[in-house]
Amino acid sequence: MLDIKRIRTDFEAVAEKLATRGVDAAVLNEMKEIDAKRRNILVKVETLKAERNTVSAEIAQAKRNKENTDDKIAAMQNLSAEVKALDAELAEIDAKLTEFTTTLPNIPADSVPVGTDEDDNVEVRRWGTPREFDFEPKAHWDLGEDLGILDWERGGKVTGARFLFYKGLGARLERAIYNFMLDEHGKEGYTEVITPYIVNHDSMFGTGQYPKFKEDTFELSDTNFVLIPTAEVPLTNYYRDEILDGKDLPIYFTAMSPSFRSEAGSAGRDTRGLIRLHQFHKVEMVKFAKPEESYEELEKMTANAENILQKLNLPYRVVALSTGDMGFSTAKTYDLEVWIPAQNNYREISSCSNTEDFQARRAQIRYRDEADGKVKLLHTLNGSGLAVGRTVAAILENYQNEDGSVTIPEALRPYMGGAEVIKP
């Protein structure tokens, strides 16, 4: 959530920044007018309350003097009625301002490339060289079916489209991947957490999914509960409405969880395979940091995600998202895109973001600065470390052999019970 004071005092700069995110200037101008009206009403209310206090004192004095107070009582009643009417108007204005501030996206950092969509993203670096096959590489969905480790047909029968069963070494591979990821993040100082997989609406508001993106979630009917779209939600809300000790920052959390997404805006995209599912496992990283340290922490988090891909020897690239492609809550995002041979393309496998104080303001996560003792909003960061299903897809395709088998990456073999190859 944006700081209304910043919008008020630095309106032109904020409007210019948000315009790069597709926010119409008319929206901000309307917000500015409503805010000005609110401040004018506040002045009127304070003036009327002061007058009312004066009249009240005069009534008390008149009663002590045994004078008639009818006119003064009538005047005070009129003043009270005016205050009540203005308070009601203020409540309506505050609701409108809240609607504005909770639905406007975050202000992009100065280092974010300006653009309208993913075509304007900027590649930062690449790692690894895509493998050259001397045979036609198969898509991971065909490999998974041929190996008998991924079953979309029965997933569709039991549930519906974009669901599947992992079987045998496929299930073992999925488990090996997320255990490996959690172990690697643990080495980097992350505290492993098992979170609830259901959260309440306040938690969804805190991280920015609600109210703007309700259609993308799975709500439990007639309850205050939602299936988590990512472990970012429970991990970030862990400290909602709390004041942390500044000396304890930064704090690192990691968690593996299922993620549930309706993919309401993705009809027709990636209808086959593991790239876009309604339910998938993901290892998440979340950080709580002081504002002056958060961008250094973003670089470290991105490196933590890269470490996984490097140890799995999967070629990838790092991309800085443009203002038009960033998520709602983020001030800056790096995407990690892994090479998918059958698509001859890099596909997103991780997003690492600094939301600055956007989520912290919504969730009221603060810290007491040990230097001056003041309570301040901290910065929150989140990143995929990594999306597990997409990692399975990348391994199947990059490690496939001409006979249809798939070699298991060396880093995962200690987690695979001695298996080195998945064979038909």
Swiss-Prot record:
Keywords: Aminoacyl-tRNA synthetase, ATP-binding, Cytoplasm, Ligase, Nucleotide-binding, Protein biosynthesis
Chief location: cytoplasm
Record bears the keyword Iron-sulfur: no
Positions in coiled-coil regions: none
Stored InterPro entries: aa-tRNA-synt_IIb, aa-tRNA-synth_II, aa-tRNA-synth_II/BPL/LPL, Ser-tRNA-ligase_type_1, Ser-tRNA-synth_1_N, SerRS_1_N_sf, SerRS_core, tRNA-bd_arm
Annotated residues for binding of ATP: R261, S262, E263, E348, I349, S350, S351
Superkingdom per UniProt: Bacteria
Subcellular location: Cytoplasm
GO biological process: selenocysteine biosynthetic process; seryl-tRNA aminoacylation
GO CC annotation terms, alphabetical: cytoplasm
Keyword hit for tRNA-binding: no
Catalysed reactions, semicolon-separated: tRNA(Ser) + L-serine + ATP = L-seryl-tRNA(Ser) + AMP + diphosphate + H(+); tRNA(Sec) + L-serine + ATP = L-seryl-tRNA(Sec) + AMP + diphosphate + H(+)
EC number, UniProt record: 6.1.1.11
Enzyme kind, highest EC tier: ligase
Binding site for L-serine: T230, A231, E232, E284, S384
The protein's assembly and partners: Homodimer. The tRNA molecule binds across the dimer.
Function: Catalyzes the attachment of serine to tRNA(Ser). Is also able to aminoacylate tRNA(Sec) with serine, to form the misacylated tRNA L-seryl-tRNA(Sec), which will be further converted into selenocysteinyl-tRNA(Sec).
NCBIfam families (UniProt xref): serS
Name of the protein described by the UniProt record: Serine--tRNA ligase
Gene: serS
